[in-house]
Swiss-Prot record:
It is a multi-pass membrane protein. It is found in: Membrane. Glycans are attached at N7. Residues 127-166 are annotated as: Disordered. This is Putative transmembrane protein encoded by LINC00477. Keywords: Glycoprotein, Membrane, Transmembrane, Transmembrane helix. The chain crosses the membrane at residues 15-35, 41-61, 63-83. Its main location: membrane. It comes from Homo sapiens (Human). One of its GO terms (cellular component) is membrane.
Length: 166
């Protein structure tokens, strides 16, 4: 049963108060599984559904609504982040993941630094760095070869390349 449908009949309904909430168990599971499969394709869709559940909680009573005003706004902003955080915890050992939400969330403030020591990537195994068999000082340093004969680029093409106006 969706949070904004109600089969109960109530005689007095106060529309001005926050009676429903997006942070209901059903909507939490919905956002949790939707955000675990979340990508850039479903980002706009989940953001649109945030507004649906938010306004449904504001405008109508809900049999599953258990939070009031402040936690309604809290759930509205934090539900999708919690779902993405549980998805991103599986891939924290790879720093090459494209913009994980925990990194965006914790590095958004300029005064805050990302706690690298508390994530799994800090204890990831380090790969050995390949070194040359001999130090670089013993390797022959060849100078860059210079052309000594033949027409230069300006003489060959005239005032400029034919495809580039000079």
């Amino acid at each position: 049963m969706l949070p904004f449908f109600s089969n109960t009949t109530s005689k007095s309904v106060s529309v001005s108060s926050f009676q429903g909430s997006p942070a209901t168990p059903l909507s939490f599971l919905f956002f949790f599984f939707l955000c675990r499969a979340g990508s850039s394709m479903t980002g706009c869709f989940t953001f649109f559904l945030d507004f649906i559940f938010f306004f449904a909680g504001v405008l109508g009573p809900s049999p599953m609504g258990m939070y009031s005003g402040a936690s309604t706004l809290t759930g509205f902003f934090l539900l999708r982040f919690l779902g993405q955080l549980s998805m991103d915890l599986e891939g924290l050992e790879w720093l090459g993941r494209a913009s994980p939400s925990w990194w965006i969330f914790f590095s958004s403030s300029p005064s805050h630094r990302v706690p690298w020591g508390s994530c799994a990537s800090a204890s990831a195994p380090r790969l050995p760095v390949p070194h040359p068999p001999s130090p670089l000082s013993k390797c022959p340093q060849h100078p860059r070869p210079r052309r000594t004969k033949g027409p230069g680029l300006r003489k060959l093409w005239g005032p400029g390349p034919p495809f580039f106006p000079s």
